[in-house]
Amino acid sequence: MSRLAKKPIVLPQGVTVEIKDNVVKVKGPKGELSQEFLPYVKIEVEGNEVWVRPNEEQIIRKSDWRKVKMFQGTYWSLIRNMVVGVTEGYKKELEIVGIGYRAQLQGNTLVMNLGYAHPVVYEIPSDVKIEVPAPNRIIVSGIDKQRVGQVAAEIRAFRPPNVYTGKGIRYVGEVVRQKEGKKA
């Protein structure tokens, strides 16, 4: 049994969990998330707690226990992330470093000048909110942890930090190890 799944996921007030045909729906004050799961584990709601237990029917061979334990911990974390997402939400902050590098919102698109000959245009997905409080700062927020991280990674990939100069888009707090330049 996974060490994580030995403990239940405690549901805060205002959060409900529905389980139907291996699909878990979590509703909360910020919205609703749903996720489909494989039948290796049983997900049960008891009061204000969610338990993730092994599904004994799926274990045919002794070697199946390893797979069941693996999915048990993974699904426990995914459900916990869904509960936190619908109550608090997730946020990733990016900073743009470089002279002339900046970002701005234009309707439903993020337009960035990143030193290329043309501005980089990124279409903002509907399930994620992007704010630009300053020209060199981007805040990506939403209720789905995986989606927020994916969008932040896509934006960072347009101009990752240069290892020699440090210019580019980086996460706030990310330390970029810089290499030494050429010796003259």
UniProtKB/Swiss-Prot annotation:
Keywords: Ribonucleoprotein, Ribosomal protein, RNA-binding, rRNA-binding. It comes from the Bacteria. One of its GO terms (biological process) is cytoplasmic translation. One of its GO terms (molecular function) is rRNA binding. The keyword Ribosomal protein applies. Gene3D superfamilies: Ribosomal protein L6, alpha-beta domain. Coiled coil: none annotated. InterPro entries: Ribosomal_uL6-like, Ribosomal_uL6-like_a/b-dom_sf, Ribosomal_uL6_a/b-dom, Ribosomal_uL6_bac-type. SUPFAM superfamilies: Ribosomal protein L6. GO terms for cellular component: cytosolic large ribosomal subunit. This protein binds to the 23S rRNA, and is important in its secondary structure. It is located near the subunit interface in the base of the L7/L12 stalk, and near the tRNA binding site of the peptidyltransferase center. HAMAP family: Ribosomal_uL6_B. PANTHER family: 60S/50S RIBOSOMAL PROTEIN L6/L9, LARGE RIBOSOMAL SUBUNIT PROTEIN UL6M. Belongs to the universal ribosomal protein uL6 family. Part of the 50S ribosomal subunit. This is Large ribosomal subunit protein uL6.
